[in-house]
Amino acid sequence: MRMPKLMLAACAVGSLSLAGATLAPLPRAACAQQPRVSYAEDIAPILKGWCVSCHQPGGQGFEASGLDLTSYDAMMKGTKFGPMIIAGQPDSSNLIVLIEGRAQLRMPYGHKALPACLRQNIWTWIFEGAKNN
């Protein structure tokens, strides 16, 4: 039953115009293969550079979905439609579904897709348990 909620969230977010949002450039070593992925060192910088401009209180993505990506705890609360991350299950996590474009829309909405290596880092972090490390 996650997909109907996800589709509702996607439709809500998809109706927004995010033309004014800016994306940060990739950190120089952002795509280096990591033996373990850290939230603080690897995931938080991706979210800050690509997602937080919309997914923070007052942002368009937050207003549409309730998803706050400004901190680990806020992110793990999920959206008003349900959880975004299922620790240990990246392919069942709505965050992965959205950044991979497997829903009706892809995140970041209205912008270039996250580079594959950054998507892989997020996938690996969730697979490793989505720890606040």
How would you name each of these model-derived features?
Residues 9-21:
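Bacterial N-terminal signal peptides
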Residues 23-133:
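Aromatic- and Gly/Pro-enriched helix-to-coil junctions and flexible linker segments
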Residues 1-5:
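Positively charged n-region of N-terminal signal peptides that target proteins for export
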